[in-house]
Amino acid sequence: KEYNNGKIIGEWVSLPCEGLEEVLHKISNNGNDELFISDYETDISNLKISEYDDILQLNEIAEEIDNLSDDEVIALQAYLEQYNDIEQALEEVRQGNYTIYYDCDDMSDVAYQVVNESGLLDGVPETIKGYFDYEAYGRDIDIEGTFIQVDNNIIELY
């Protein structure tokens, strides 16, 4: 009602917010006016918030995100690129359905880590190891899986 009459009442709120219900009650004219989100900022890449998202639900999601480890935040960003659905992305993170390959610029870096961690070339003489094609192996594992780059990390999603 107030909005339609040209009177906009709003307040910047950082989530999670303990007193959110009080703030919402105040800016909604004691619950008589519709609330909407006109702007937002987030450090979580690929997190999309729409104008009429449930602010109380967003507050709960923000609390959960605040409790995530750095690795879980990296995985969350990858899942958001894959699904664009925060609830589904958080569920996948909770289940731990990912592997993070750190400091990777491309899939050849991932291939190098996979080969070294798996011991794939253990027992192969050093003079022959130099001929291994990490770029080609990286292309092959990229085709076989789902890999998302977040900053300088590549995350494999299962």
What are these regions (language model features)?
Residues 2, 111-158:
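Acidic, proline/glycine-rich low-complexity IDRs
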Residues 14, 36-39, 149, 156:
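Residues in well-ordered beta-strands of folded domains
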Residues 1-32:
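N-terminal ordered "arm"
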Residues 102-107:
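Short helix/strand-capping turn motifs
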Residues 20-84:
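Structured domain cores in non-transmembrane regions
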Residues 81-97:
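Structured, non-catalytic alpha/beta "coupling" segments that mediate domain-domain communication
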Residues 38-40, 74-77, 91-93, 125-127, ...:
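Short coil/turn segments at secondary-structure boundaries
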